[in-house]
Amino acid sequence: MGNNYGFGRIVLTIVFAMGLKIAPLSAIFAVYNPDWVLLVLIYWSLAVPERVGIFHAWTFGLLTDVLTGRLLGQYALAYSLVIYICLMLHKRLRQLPFIQQALFIFFCLLLSQLLLFFIKNIQQTAELKPTFWLPVFVGTVCWPLVYTVLRFVRLAKPIKTD
């Protein structure tokens, strides 16, 4: 139960993030909705890189594609690329001050958002609106909250049921 219990927490947090991603929001708030799934995947890939990798990013990316009704593989490609970069730099990133980590998160979210835009632009002509950047900024601002909550989840001791 020891190894699977920790992975269960990881999957649960990612599934919760998927719920936040597809939660119905009014048009006003929908443009501010950051990519919760990517934020959670980034956290877990930095915190426990031996448990969360490119395969998990690809898998949850495909699930996100299905849940959002986007072209199959869009999120899978974006998440895999970002998590690959995180895994390559995770030892350095863990040593950085929080502000610099947030700057890295900004660039990860920006890379994902741009990749999704370019894929959408190949599929159909897409217009780059100013609201396109809002989820990147909101996600960067939400990073301290995501980090704190997921760190608490990771370090919480399991409840014994005897």
Please provide the spans of the model-predicted regions:
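Terminal, non-globular segments
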Residues: 1-162
